[in-house]
Structures are given as C-alpha cells and as structure tokens.
C-alpha cells in the first residue's frame, strides 16, 4: 500500500485510536484527504481499476483481481455511498462462512480491509 485516500467524512487517520490500532503503520504510507468522486473519475480515466466492497459483491476468492488499482472500503454503518458505488468498476464481497441463515452481515472495516488486502497480496 503506497497511499490512503480519505474523504471529508472519514475518521481522522491521526486520531490517537487510529494511530494505536495501526501500530504505527500509518506513518509508512502517504495519506491524502480528497474529493473521492473526482479522484475516482481521474483514476478510472487513467485505466486504473476501482474495486468496492459490498455485501452483494462478487466473492473475493473466486473473482479475477488486478495487481494494481484502488480499493474503496465503506463506512461500517453506512457502507459505500451510491455516488461512490457508481464509480466502482467491480464490486467485491467477503463470503460468510456461516452454514445457516444467521450469518454476520458485515465486518469491522479494519478486519475487512485486512482480509481484502491479504487476498490481493496472495495473488501477486
């Protein structure tokens, strides 16, 4: 990961709880606060794939993934906005391992990010 892009509604990456949770890793990447719709449009025009994480996306373990691009992680409570969803080229999901209908609907965004990044790295 070289860059993290945040919108105005994102939790402050330098919030003490965020810094502690990252174990200092936040200081090894470049962080930008930006207008995400503008950024995503620019990156798509440059040919970079934009992946989004959704409850109704394609299974991350069986979907073709790129070795480059941008991954959008949604807010834990609200998910990804409709505006940002329209700019994602591929919708991904982490499948539930529950064998019954009482599965978890969503994961903590930090846990979900770790799982998603791990799968991209595994495929490199």
What are these regions (language model features)?
Residues 32, 37-40, 44, 57, ...:
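Generic hydrophobic alpha-helical scaffold/packing signal
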Residues 51-105:
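Active-site/ligand-binding-proximal alpha/beta "capping" segment
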């Amino acid at each position: 990961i070289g860059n993290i892009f945040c919108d105005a509604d994102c939790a402050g990456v330098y919030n003490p709880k965020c810094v502690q949770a990252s174990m200092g890793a936040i200081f090894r990447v470049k962080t930008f606060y930006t207008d995400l719709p503008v950024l995503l449009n620019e990156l798509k025009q440059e040919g970079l794939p934009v992946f989004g994480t959704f409850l109704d996306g394609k299974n991350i373990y069986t979907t073709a993934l790129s070795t480059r691009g941008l991954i959008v992680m949604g807010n834990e409570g609200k998910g990804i906005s409709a505006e940002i969803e329209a700019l994602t080229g591929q919708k991904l999901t982490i499948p539930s391992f529950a064998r019954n209908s009482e599965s978890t609907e969503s994961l903590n965004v930090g846990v979900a990010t770790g799982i998603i990044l791990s799968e991209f790295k595994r495929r490199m």
